[in-house]
From Swiss-Prot:
Source species of the chain: Bacillus subtilis (strain 168)
Domain of life of the source: Bacteria
Coiled-coil regions, chain positions: 9-36
Biological classification of the source: Bacteria, Bacillati, Bacillota, Bacilli, Bacillales
Keywords of this entry: Coiled coil
Protein name: SPbeta prophage-derived uncharacterized protein YomR
Length: 405
């Protein structure tokens, strides 16, 4: 290395050394200042803690909330105690300060009365007027002997001298009637017309005892909430009444009879309604059927016939085409002249089968048959024919019975 470069490097090293020396001085100064500040804060904190400790030590107002139980005085009441003078005064009080009664000291029967003096007692003991003498005692004892005779005579008196009544001897319910003799009693015992035999008793005890109605003949059960469950909770043969508002009840109020098997899996209910209708319902293997109305002959015989409405040129043949609904069926009767494969007449939908129906009808003018379609909307039409001579057909006999369901 040349001398000039050496000198330059030396100067640079001196500069760095001086710089490090200055940094070290500043760090040392900072540490001294920090140490002094920390010392001041520590002194202040110690002084504060000493003051707080002194305040706590001087606090006499139970700062730790110590209870009387914690110091073993849980049973002591917070009441003013008597002074020694007051206690001594009470101890020396002979005027019954606690209001002790004579019963409490075992003298409940003693009266609060003045007792006789010894002189008064002696005077009383020597009083021959109040007390009897020996001769008087002898006289009175002799009188007692006479009294015993009177007593014995009275005790032997069997004519009810004290007028004792039947009620007083516990026989108030008995009447003063003549009693049967032994012969009469035995004859009554042997009377088999008035008394039942053991065979008769067994027969009557084995008779049916279950009620089917109330004592006055009215329904035994009144169904108000659930027809099915209330019937199943009734005896196996029951006369019942019901409210139409009950679940599963018929549409009108009425009365009926219920009969079922012992296990209540099979049964029948039949009801007569207040509006003169009859319904029945079945229980089959635990499953209930719907209500079925029983139609009377008068209802079937007296249902009026109604005329159909013709369409598409159809007309009456030998008889007008009529319809009616009887016992869940549609009845059609008449002779109609019409073309096939067209709607030739209509009836109201409430008279029509819900799923529609097909029936076979006879033709007129020749031998043959055609199909009658009764639609669920009430339309009637004929379709297809099988006849000896289809050209000779003059009409169709519509005489059929169609189930509505």
């Amino acid at each position: 290395m040349s001398s000039s470069k050496y000198v330059g490097q030396l100067k640079q090293n001196n500069i760095q050394i001086n710089s490090l020396r200055g940094s070290n001085d500043r760090a040392e100064k900072h540490m001294l200042e920090h140490e002094q500040a920390l010392t001041e804060k520590t002194n202040l904190f110690m002084e504060y803690q000493q003051n707080e400790l002194k305040k706590h030590t001087d606090d006499k107002s139970n700062p730790h909330l110590v209870t009387k139980e914690q110091v073993g005085l849980g049973n002591v009441l917070n009441n003013v105690q008597a002074t020694k003078e007051e206690f001594d005064e009470h101890l020396n009080d002979t005027l019954n300060p606690h209001s002790v009664t004579k019963s409490q000291v075992g003298l409940a029967n003693v009266l609060n009365e003045k007792q006789a003096t010894k002189t008064e007692f002696d005077q009383h003991a020597q009083d021959t007027i109040i007390h009897i003498t020996a001769s008087e005692r002898t006289t009175w004892n002799a009188a007692e002997s006479n009294s015993k005779k009177y007593t014995d005579a009275h005790s032997q008196n069997t004519n009810n001298p004290h007028k004792v009544t039947a009620i007083q001897v516990g026989l108030g319910n008995l009447t003063n009637d003549k009693q049967a003799t032994k012969l009469e009693f035995d004859a009554h015992i042997k009377d088999n017309e008035r008394h039942i035999t053991s065979t008769e008793r067994s027969k009557w005890n084995s008779a049916q005892l279950t009620k089917i109605s109330s004592d006055d003949g009215q329904p035994l059960v009144s169904i108000t909430s659930d027809f099915h469950s209330e019937l199943l909770n009734s005896p196996t043969l029951t006369y019942f009444g019901y409210d139409k508002a009950a679940l599963e009840a018929p549409p009108s109020n009425g009365r009926g009879f219920w009969t079922c098997s012992a296990d209540k899996l099979y049964g029948q209910a039949i009801v007569l309604t207040n509006d003169n209708k009859t319904y029945r319902k079945s229980l089959i293997n635990g499953a209930w059927s719907s209500w079925e109305r029983l139609i009377s002959s008068s209802e079937i015989d007296n249902v009026p016939w109604l005329s159909v409405t013709y369409k598409n040129g159809a007309k009456t043949g030998s008889r007008p085409l009529q319809y009616r609904k009887v016992a869940g069926t549609l009845q059609l009767s008449g002779h109609v002249v019409t073309n096939r494969d067209v709607v030739f007449a209509s009836i109201p939908t409430e008279f029509s089968p819900t799923q529609g129906a097909v029936k076979s009808v006879e033709v007129s003018g020749t031998f043959g048959r055609s199909k009658l379609f009764v639609n669920s909307n009430g339309d009637l039409q004929l379709s297809g024919v099988s006849a000896d001579n289809s050209a000779a057909i003059t009409g169709y006999y519509i005489d059929v019975v169609v189930p509505l369901n």
